[in-house]
Amino acid sequence: MIGGCFDPEFRTWSNGLIDDFRARRFNLVLSDVTAAEIRRAPAQVRELHTELAELAENLSVTEEALYLLEQYEAHRVLDSRFRNDMLHIALATVAAVDVLVSWTFQHIVRLDMIQRFIGANLELGYRPLAIYSPREVTTYEREV
């Protein structure tokens, strides 16, 4: 989502959501997994992540999140090449985050994939996790 701030296709909505975080309209939650991925990103993305990390709650990888990741793999929710994406969702699920926000339409922000995660979560005793794109979440161009 942070990288979307610098992508012509996604910047309007990504920056709108970043403004929402800065205005404290929503609580931002990041993770150690996000930080590790950002290390490989362009400098402007790393700089924005550093700024946002000051506003955010940070989630560390826990045994419970790793267990849930293994369950997602066992349920074949996603292909194993998307292990980090499943870990993001496991971390958010275990932490009872309200919404996971992503621009990854290929295998996350897609109804059938969301239903797979919800099904696995319910079967394993976790609540469903809402998954949306920044455009669906930001208050940009809406009355607040």
What residues fall within each predicted segment?
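Short, well-structured N-terminal submotif of metal-dependent ribonuclease cores
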Residues: 1-30, 37-50, 74-79, 114-117, ...
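A generic structural signal for well-ordered alpha-helical segments
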Residues: 21, 51-52, 92, 124
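Short active-site oxyanion
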Residues: 24-28, 54-57, 98
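Acidic catalytic patch
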Residues: 33-37, 55-78
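Acidic, PIN/NYN-like endoribonuclease modules and their adjacent C-terminal/linker elements
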Residues: 8-11, 35, 78, 93-144
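Conserved glycosyltransferase catalytic-site signature
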Residues: 82-89, 105
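General small-molecule cofactor/ligand-binding pocket signal
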Residues: 29, 59-60, 130-132
